[in-house]
Design a protein with these regions (language model features):
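Conserved tyrosine-mediated DNA breakage-rejoining catalytic core shared by Y-recombinases
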Residues: 148-149, 204-246
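Short, polar N-cap/turn motifs at the start of nucleic acid-interacting alpha helices
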Residues: 209-214, 294-296, 315-334
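Short, basic (Lys/Arg/His-rich) helix/loop patches that form interaction surfaces
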Residues: 178, 282-322
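Catalytic-site neighborhood detector that most strongly recognizes the C-terminal catalytic loop/helix
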Residues: 162, 219-223, 263-264, 324-349
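Basic, Lys/Arg- and aromatic-enriched nucleic-acid-binding interface segment
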Residues: 143-199, 203
Length: 357
């Protein structure tokens, strides 16, 4: 009898050891596969696994991103966690996250005033954490709530933010006598001309990135998500050079082109300066848009307009995709204002025979 009890106890111990081994192995393989393995990162990941709550897994992910210097992603995960805790509290069990729970969560976010695109971002980050938990064996396949026939994240179509070439010309000529308006207008125009560059990449440009009359850079947004570094090259047209001459630092090889960063910032302060500049550009450009009767103009508008102006001019979508640094054409298609009102009106007019009043 005692021997049988010992045998059962040994079997249970072996199962625990095997389970722990599989969790550690899965964590190591996942981190190594993403190029982010370190003992600290492994420790953070295993802390999340040991706690067995969604909240703790989020906090482990946030700590992992902070140590990797990925402040933008860290802040997004932190924001998503706050929303989750407003909805379901500070100890969310993995088995509580069901299809019906996700529907209620999406409804809750909608009632908070979030648009579909933002709701989709929250749900995708929750799904990413559950994917980590699934790889670690914490969430069984039968428990996993996302996917075909389960909960499918509804994607927002995306706002059509593109301006016409005529509107961009009016922005370029706009003056109100304010130096701040002139500077932020020029920064916005530089974003547009520089392949719709994101502000996070704009602030990090240095004079050494200009090679043979082209600016060369790798998008910060994709440098951690792709195995091959995709370099974007932008011809420095005279209008861009004029903006550099007007607002840039002295043209020394290691200097930042624009006086936003000074090179002493840690990742968090770099992110904060980027966010501050983005807000400043958006605030000033919103005022410009109102004065010109164009509507709201933002840094996103610059990126969308770059893509759409090229498309209207007949540029190949593959070229536009490469210029934006996208990994697939579908992302680019989302950027393009394919169904603008003017295009719909033109196509509708084709249906009307001559002489039909």
């Amino acid at each position: 009898m005692l021997g049988a009890t010992k045998a059962r106890a040994l079997v249970a111990v072996r199962k625990d050891i095997e389970s722990s081994y599989q969790i550690v192995r899965a964590a190591v393989e996942d981190l190594a596969g993403n190029g982010g393995f370190s003992l600290d990162a492994l420790n953070d990941r295993l802390k999340g696994a040991a706690s067995n709550t969604v909240n703790a897994m989020f906090r482990a992910k946030i700590a992992e991103l902070e140590k990797a210097g990925r402040v933008g992603s860290m802040l997004v995960y932190d924001n998503v966690l706050k929303g989750l805790e407003r909805f379901a509290g500070e100890r969310i069990q993995f088995d509580a996250v069901t299809v019906s729970w996700l529907k209620r969560y999406a409804d809750f976010l909608g009632k908070e005033g979030k648009v579909q695109t933002t709701i989709s971002i929250h749900l995708r980050h929750l799904r990413a954490v559950l994917n980590d938990a699934r790889r670690l064996g914490i969430v069984k396949e039968t428990q996993y709530p996302f996917g075909r026939g389960r909960y499918e994240i509804q994607e927002g179509e995306g706002r059509k933010l593109a301006l016409t070439l005529e509107q961009i010309g009016r922005i370029a000529r706009y003056e109100d006598g304010s130096e701040a308006t002139a500077k932020y207008r020029d920064y916005w125009l530089f974003l547009y001309l520089c392949n719709g560059i994101n502000v996070a990449d704009f602030v990090k440009l240095r004079y050494r990135d200009i090679v043979d009359g082209e600016i060369c850079f790798v998008r910060q947004k994709t440098e951690h998500t792709t195995k091959t570094r995709k370099e974007i090259r932008v011809v420095v047209v005279p209008q861009m050079q004029a903006i550099i001459d007007r607002w840039g630092n002295p043209p020394v090889r290691n200097n930042f082109i624009f006086p936003v960063l000074d090179g002493t910032e840690d990742a968090i302060h770099q992110k904060l300066k980027t966010m501050y500049l983005t807000r400043a550009i958006n605030k000033r450009m919103q005022e410009v848009g109102e004065q010109l009767g164009i509507g709201n103009i933002s840094t996103y508008t610059a990126r969308h307009s770059f893509a759409t102006v090229l498309k209207r001019a007949g540029a190949n979508i593959a070229y536009i995709s490469e210029s934006l640094g996208h990994q697939d054409l579908k992302t680019t298609e989302n950027y393009l204002a394919s169904f603008e009102r003017e295009e719909r009106e033109k196509n509708a007019a084709i249906l009307i025979p001559d002489g039909w009043k």
